[in-house]
Swiss-Prot record:
Gene3D superfamilies: HAD superfamily/HAD-like
Coiled coil: none
CDD domains: HAD_VSP (cd07535)
Keyword Signal among record annotations: yes
Glycosylation sites: 126
Entry keyword set: Glycoprotein, Seed storage protein, Signal, Storage protein
Protein name listed in UniProt: Stem 31 kDa glycoprotein
Tissue specificity field: Accumulates in the stems of developing soybean seedlings.
Organism: Glycine max
Functional note: May function as somatic storage protein during early seedling development.
Length: 291
């Protein structure tokens, strides 16, 4: 009995300390920068949501960002993600309400022309200037997303655009989508800035997806360039596909404190699970001794 209890105790301690050895997120945390990290590695960590909540890209990474965007890699990365979405969709049996949900800015419409004029992400995001650019309605299509969109339409999927753009931009957004080559969609959902129930992007998009599901839509795929496009609940039976965003990644619904605590929550849950398992071993040993 003593031996079983000792082994169980070691098991719990080992599992609980495993968090220290295998953290779920980089210990640099919320928006932190490690100077010795190369720009390509920094970008990868951002895309993987290990670095988040930053206001600008590092100044020393501007040239690397330009090379990434204007070279072959950015389009190649976009192509790979869109291809995987298509390969997944191609193997599905399509039903009338099966739907793919797309974000707009940075996903179907490129905002690279804006960032090209504003430091490729090294300048702090200015919503007023960005809105002025959006209202011109000249955003080009992201070519690989447009190809995927056309393929999904031909397969029979409903297309829903779910954007953080506000309702007052509906007309310019519809015109820009058509100008860029997106000629048909089921719904265009824009944000009501007066709605207090959705204070951030994740809660807004979660609520929008919940409404779609209540309306009978079956969300089978979500494609976006921001983690806020993909996080949250009510994603139906979907797979999510994260497109690269080389210039900026907006903060998700997690605050810095919540984000840093998330791995600890999982860590505590794991310890409780292992502790319960160890307790069962002890009880079993005691019962055997009694019998």
């Amino acid at each position: 009995k003593v031996l079983v209890f000792f082994v169980a105790t070691i098991l719990v301690a080992w599992q609980c300390h495993a968090y220290d050895m295998f953290p779920l997120r980089m210990n640099t945390g919320y928006g932190a920068r490690t100077p010795e990290v190369k720009c390509a590695s920094w970008r990868l960590a951002v895309e993987a949501h290990n670095i988040f909540g930053f206001e600008t890209i590092p100044e020393e990474c501007v040239e690397a960002t330009k090379e990434y965007i204007h070279g072959e890699q950015y389009r190649s990365d976009s192509k790979t993600v869109n291809q995987q979405a298509y390969f997944y969709a191609r193997d599905l049996e399509v039903h009338p309400k099966d739907t793919f949900v797309f974000s707009i800015d940075g996903t179907v419409l490129s905002n690279i022309p804006y960032y090209k004029k504003h430091g490729y992400g090294v300048e702090k995001f200015n919503s007023t200037l960005y809105d002025e650019w959006v209202n011109k309605g000249n955003a080009p299509a992201l070519p690989e997303t447009l190809k995927n969109y056309n393929k999904l339409v031909s397969l029979g999927f409903k297309i829903i655009f779910l954007s953080g753009r506000t309702l007052d931009k509906q007309a310019v957004t519809e015109a820009n989508l058509k100008k860029a080559g997106y000629h048909t969609w089921e719904k265009l959902i824009l944000k009501d800035p007066q709605d207090p129930s959705t204070p951030n992007a994740v809660s807004y998009k979660t609520a929008a997806r919940e409404k779609l599901i209540r309306q009978g839509y079956n969300i089978v795929g979500i494609i976006g360039d921001q983690w806020s496009d993909l996080l949250g609940g009510h994603r139906g039976e979907s797979r999510t596909f994260k497109l690269p965003n080389p210039c900026t990644t907006f903060s998700s619904s997690f605050t810095s404190q919540q984000s840093s605590l998330l791995p600890i929550y999982l860590y505590v849950i794991r310890c409780v699970q292992i502790g319960a398992l160890a307790s069962l071993y002890v009880v079993s040993a005691v019962c055997q001794q009694v019998m």
